[in-house]
Amino acid sequence: VFEGEELSSNIIKSQIKVVCEDISPKAIKVGMVSSPQIIKDIVDTLDQYPCEYLVVDPVMISKSGYSLLRPEAKQNLIKYLIPKAYIVTPNIPEAEEITNMKIETVEDMKKAGNIILNMGPKYVLMKGGHLEGDCVDVLIGKDMFEVFKGERINRKNTHGTGCTISSAITSHLALGYDIKESIRLSKEYITEAIKYSFDIGHGVGPVHHFYKFEESKIK
């Protein structure tokens, strides 16, 4: 990411309105939102069209280091959007920003997840890909602590992994899977998408979202 430009609040509100009035989605994911006003407008609009599962992926910084959330927007994220969520899916840097604590271990992930859980969502999935060793994600809920371990794939092409797994979780919830199975299936999916990712250009390449539909996998 080298540059970003915000859409107007009006077009974002209209997009939500048109989709929700047409198909009444069972699950909705909110990803990158950059400004305090857009966050507030999204929350106000979603209040008019409640869904069963709201997944919030608090995207803040791109893989290339580009800031995607204005500093002044963090408070609205915490105050308005996170409390509405069925599940919040921060990675380590995002969770550190939200909780103002350093996260270096799985136990730290649990502590940070509980801080975010107290902000109002039903579940928090702490994505541990930034830690060393196996890819360990931690699901925290009321009286729940579940560890999901996954294979670490030694490839540089991980652009979009966080957005992809949160979208996959949203899709599995909409299909009727419970929260644990939605996460398990989504982790399997993103692991394979990274394994068969694309070498394009000189930067961090994209994962291969459609690897299942190709007879010959791209390596």
Describe every region a protein language model picked out.
Residues 1-63, 67:
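Conserved N-terminal subdomain of the carbohydrate kinase-like
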Residues 71-145:
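Conserved phosphate/ATP/ADP-binding segment of small-molecule kinases
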Residues 97, 155-179:
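Short, small-residue alpha-helix embedded
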Residues 102-109, 174-184:
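Short, charged, surface-exposed loops that flank catalytic or proteolytic processing sites
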Residues 181-219:
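Charged C-terminal helix
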